[in-house]
Amino acid sequence: MNPNHAIAAVRIFAVSGALVLNSACTQPAQEEVPMTSPEHKLVVTMELWTEAYVKRDTATVGQAVVDSILVHAADGRHVWVTRQGLNQFLIETPKFSWDIQSIDYVGHSDGKDVVVVRGREQRSYEDGRVFDEHLAEFFAWKGGRIVEVTQYRRTP
């Protein structure tokens, strides 16, 4: 084989390989990629739930909450929060934000799957109360619904 022919063949092969690689990398993402595990699916569900919470989407938020959930607040209080109360909070709280830093599956305990959400919550009320907290919030899920939340303050 002539050396010029060999170089031309290598160039054709390299170009065709690059085209194949390029077309493989530019294929549209599949919308219905199966979840890798139930744990991953729960984390994705939690991501969607927190997004709905921040957007004050009461319908989506309420769907994932049982009639009332026990909240162990970072300030030491233990309160029952009803779905209606949570929706009222979302509607009536003038200013709040929740900067999510991470959402991770923690494990399974007492028949519940637990997901931790780490982030910064800021709320201000018309009466002057202001909350600015870095929290780790553990959400216990059972049967596709949030049944309990435990909050811990953390340093950034």
Where does each model-flagged region fall?
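Hydrophobic/aromatic beta-strand elements that line small-molecule binding cavities or substrate pockets
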Residues: 86, 100-107, 120-122, 134-140, ...
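Short, low-complexity N-terminal intrinsically disordered segments enriched in polar/charged residues
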Residues: 25-68
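N-terminal secretory signal peptides that target proteins for export/translocation
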Residues: 1-8
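A solvent-exposed, acidic/Ser-Thr-rich amphipathic alpha-helical stretch
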Residues: 39, 58-110
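Short beta-strand edge/turn micro-motifs at domain boundaries
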Residues: 28, 132-156
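A short hydrophobic beta-strand element
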Residues: 111-121
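Bacterial N-terminal signal peptides
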Residues: 11-22
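Short, cysteine-centered beta-strand-loop-beta hairpins and adjacent loop/turn segments enriched
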Residues: 95, 123-131
